[in-house]
């Protein structure tokens, strides 16, 4: 790993160093204790848990400001959480995650201590779309609760799952939130048009949100599907209510993501909505 020269000690667990003229952040339990500017460090004399090379000055400044306002025990739990996530089977870009997750947990903890809880309307959607990330996030929350002697609500599992998933998917946090929002509004339209309550534990729900997720990705890549004209006519005639509902949902997607919608897309979404209708008729 070479030699690191301390340029700033942020707290007992984090130091900023230079290594071959590259500024890096070293993280490890007690790594910053009694460390002064100009001291030389190496992996023979200290235990380095993580090394981060933050690319931009903005990233560096933001991370430094976060570390400076965090208690040592909170930061250590965050470090442990990042290590836990990095060691899972998911291909997480920990360099990107370190800033977003540190930021999120520090302020989520502060809000919790002040009894200011932010609700997450997309918990169910996140659980279904990003089940692996959600499972890991739940374990992270369990660890945070135990280490900090607090009780983060389930909403936080959803938020952290999105942070994890956004570092494994080809979508940003903003895009993933938009997709969750579209799915939620789509379910609202279905419930209104079919006069029902959608069971979010059902196979129909899981298939629907997966279809919408991949539909949006496909449309953004300009990958279109095609259905035969006679098949289109048959579905429109057989399931007029479901077709109308699908049209509403896809019109919303078209406006939200600025994509082109074909008749074939409406037809295939109609079939997914019809599964909800079938379930109603069977009950």
Curated annotation (Swiss-Prot):
InterPro entries the record matches: BglG_antiterminators, CAT_RNA-bd_dom, CAT_RNA-bd_dom_sf, PRD, PRD_sf, Transcrpt_antitermin_CS
Domain PRD: 69-173, 174-283
Top-level taxon of origin: Bacteria
Gene Ontology molecular function terms on file: RNA binding
Keywords: Repeat
KW Ribosomal protein (keyword) present: no
GO BP annotation list: positive regulation of DNA-templated transcription
Pfam families for this protein: CAT_RBD, PRD
Family assignment from sequence similarity: Belongs to the transcriptional antiterminator BglG family. GlcT subfamily.
PANTHER family, per database record: CRYPTIC BETA-GLUCOSIDE BGL OPERON ANTITERMINATOR, PROTEIN GLCT
Name of protein: Protein GlcT
UniProt source species: Staphylococcus aureus (strain bovine RF122 / ET3-1)
Record gene name: glcT
């Amino acid at each position: 790993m070479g030699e690191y020269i301390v340029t700033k000690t942020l707290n007992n667990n984090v130091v900023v160093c230079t290594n071959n003229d590259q500024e890096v952040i070293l993280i490890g339990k007690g790594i910053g204790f009694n460390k002064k500017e100009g001291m030389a460090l190496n992996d023979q004399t200290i235990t380095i848990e993580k090394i981060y090379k933050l690319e931009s000055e903005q990233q560096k400044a933001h991370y430094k400001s976060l570390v400076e306002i965090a208690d040592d025990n909170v930061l250590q739990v965050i470090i442990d959480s990042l290590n836990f996530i990095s060691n899972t089977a998911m291909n997480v870009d920990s360099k990107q995650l370190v800033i977003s997750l540190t930021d999120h947990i520090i302020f989520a903890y502060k809000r919790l201590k002040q009894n200011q809880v932010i609700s997450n309307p997309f918990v169910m959607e996140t659980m279904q779309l990003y089940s692996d990330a959600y499972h890991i996030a739940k374990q992270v929350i369990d660890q945070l609760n135990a280490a900090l002697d607090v009780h983060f609500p389930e909403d936080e599992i959803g938020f952290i799952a999105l942070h994890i998933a956004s570092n494994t998917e080809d979508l940003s946090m903003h895009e993933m939130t938009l997709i969750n929002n579209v799915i939620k509004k789509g379910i609202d339209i279905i419930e209104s048009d079919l006069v029902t309550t959608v069971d979010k534990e059902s196979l129909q729900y899981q298939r629907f949100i997966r279809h919408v997720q991949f539909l949006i990705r496909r449309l953004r890549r300009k990958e279109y599907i095609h259905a035969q004209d006679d098949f289109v006519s048959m579905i429109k005639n057989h399931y007029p209510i479901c077709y109308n509902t699908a049209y509403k949902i896809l019109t919303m997607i078209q406006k939200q993501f600025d994509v082109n919608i074909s008749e074939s897309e409406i037809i295939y979404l109609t079939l997914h909505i019809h599964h909800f209708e079938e379930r109603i008729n069977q009950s």
